[in-house]
């Protein structure tokens, strides 16, 4: 008898009726897998806490640190789920508000690592519970210390919450499949929960919508007759709508006095709401979708460079092995994960965002799931081979020990992927001393005279806002962002400068693309501030 046949299968229901009911209720989540998920979550969180940005950031980071605690309005698409969740989280008595919002990202990505463990366990066909748990744990840690997840875990950003919610959706729909297969009571509840989370996740980031291209086919892979289950379909549709109702935050908040400190696009009307939620400002970023296959080689080169950076060493070779294994053993699951990746990469390749790397988080999660599948298959195959090879030389107990050692060696080798990633990326990813934005804002505020107007652009406006509206610094000054000039009625930077020049001191952090023109149109003098960033200038009458 080989080690493989000696092990108890977690995919086989026990004969005892009472134990069968327990197995149905937990939908095949074994104790070792739960421990592995908890371990991956806690290890990831511990490392994230050691490397977490402690303070304010530039760009979208400071906006994500400012909007929730002040109950303001985000840039398109509004991200109301993040706002509401962030406001609740910002009430925690832990550090400063900026730190709390950064911590929210760390917790979300760490939870995604734990969910990666649970997801992976559903796709592994090996019988040993401990092997499933160990291989799934490797998958979770591989995700935790992949390049983009780790980077996004250290700063406030909607994408960190997105991957946590996306992982939750994937886990719920694959658990629904298992619950259906084993005859768990009320398996549709898992799918209904996924629908609710899907709606809420759309309120965090519409990137969630791409998951429908995989979830739709998955429903019919699991149950070809699901279209007849109209009660379940209606329940899921209703819960999806309930989740989407989070978007009501935007018009409600926009029409409550006093108006929010950050009031992007002033969505007090249907036109303003539509402009914000449907990202009409950014329609130009979608131009590539008119001809998505144009310049495909160049687009793929960029996507490949992002994806290649996520894993270390032979990581992608192991991913390919996992994909091949899953395609042979569970073609439907392979199709589901493949559609998640294809839709994600296709969109990211054609969308021109300032930090497009964040959009590949879900593809990275799927890749790490496949690492776990490959590790389990290799370990299980190795264990069976050793058990067979020692059939004539060892007794049953000896063969089992030898097989276990062989499997453990393979898992240990697979664990080198996250271990090497942790060791080699720690210094690069460490943001624990990053207080650059705070130092810059402090120097700027120190340089501004009483009642000054400062006209800035997005990367710099956001930390200025945080210090003004969250910390209460310099209530005498007016901060005008080069985009929000439109909402404030100035139309252009030039008009805003001329509207205040001679009445109030005017200072400018010129946008990179406007520096030369603005400095040639207006008389200015440089103002000394914290170095290394765009120069602050005073506009002279």
Segments predicted by a language model, with ranges:
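Transmembrane alpha-helical segments
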Residues: 146, 407-434
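Transmembrane-helix signature of polytopic, membrane-embedded enzymes
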Residues: 34-37, 116-145, 182-189, 335, ...
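Transmembrane-helix motifs of polytopic, lipid-linked glycan transferases
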Residues: 38, 103-127, 168-172, 321, ...
């Amino acid at each position: 008898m080989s080690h493989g046949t000696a092990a108890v299968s977690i995919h086989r229901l026990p004969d005892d009726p009472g134990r069968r009911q327990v197995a149905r209720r937990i939908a095949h989540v074994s104790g070792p897998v739960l421990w592995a998920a908890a371990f991956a979550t806690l290890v990831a969180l511990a490392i994230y806490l050691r490397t977490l940005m402690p303070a304010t950031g530039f760009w979208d980071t400071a906006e994500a640190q400012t909007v929730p605690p002040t109950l303001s309005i985000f840039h398109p698409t509004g991200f109301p789920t993040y706002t509401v969740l962030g406001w609740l989280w910002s009430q925690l008595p832990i550090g400063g508000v900026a730190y709390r919002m950064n911590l929210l990202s760390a917790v979300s990505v760490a939870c995604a690592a734990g969910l990666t463990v649970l997801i992976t366990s559903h796709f592994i066909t090996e019988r040993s519970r401990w092997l499933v748990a160990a291989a799934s744990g490797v998958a979770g840690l591989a995700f935790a210390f992949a390049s983009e997840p780790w980077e996004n875990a250290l700063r406030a950003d909607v994408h960190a919450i997105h991957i946590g919610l996306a992982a939750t959706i994937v886990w719920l729909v694959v658990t629904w499949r298992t619950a259906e297969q084993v005859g768990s009571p009320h398996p549709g509840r898992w799918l209904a929960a996924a629908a609710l989370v899907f709606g809420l996740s759309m309120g965090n980031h519409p990137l969630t919508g791409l998951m429908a291209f995989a979830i739709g086919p998955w429903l019919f892979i699991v149950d070809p007759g699901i279209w007849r289950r109209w009660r379940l379909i209606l329940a899921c549709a209703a819960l999806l709508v309930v989740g989407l109702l989070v978007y009501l935050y935007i018009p409600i908040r926009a029409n409550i006095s006093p108006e929010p400190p950050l009031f992007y696009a002033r969505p007090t009307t249907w036109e303003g709401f539509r402009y914000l939620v449907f990202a009409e400002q950014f329609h130009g970023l979608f131009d590539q979708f008119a001809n998505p296959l144009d310049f495909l080689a160049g687009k793929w080169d960029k996507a490949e460079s992002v994806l290649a950076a996520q894993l270390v060493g032979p990581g992608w070779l192991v991913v390919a092995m996992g994909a091949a294994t899953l395609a042979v053993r569970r073609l439907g699951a392979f199709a589901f994960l493949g559609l998640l990746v294809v839709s994600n990469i296709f969109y990211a390749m054609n969308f021109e965002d300032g930090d497009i790397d964040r959009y590949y988080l879900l593809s990275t999660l799927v890749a790490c799931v496949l690492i776990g599948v490959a590790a389990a298959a290799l370990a299980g195959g190795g264990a069976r081979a050793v058990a067979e090879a020692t059939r004539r030389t060892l007794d049953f107990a000896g063969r089992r020990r030898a097989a276990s050692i062989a499997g453990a060696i393979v898992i240990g080798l697979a664990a080198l992927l996250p271990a090497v990633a942790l060791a080699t990326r720690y210094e690069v990813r460490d943001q624990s001393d990053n207080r650059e934005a705070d130092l810059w804002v402090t120097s700027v505020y120190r340089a501004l005279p009483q009642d000054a107007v400062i006209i800035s652009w997005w990367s710099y406006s956001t930390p200025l806002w945080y210090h003004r509206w969250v910390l209460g610094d310099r209530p005498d000054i007016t901060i005008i962002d080069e985009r929000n000039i439109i909402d404030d009625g100035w139309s252009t930077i030039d008009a805003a400068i001329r509207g205040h020049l001679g009445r109030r001191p005017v200072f400018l952090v010129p946008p990179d693309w406007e520096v030369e023109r603005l400095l040639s149109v207006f008389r200015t003098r440089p103002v000394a501030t914290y170095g290394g960033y765009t120069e602050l200038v005073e506009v002279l009458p």
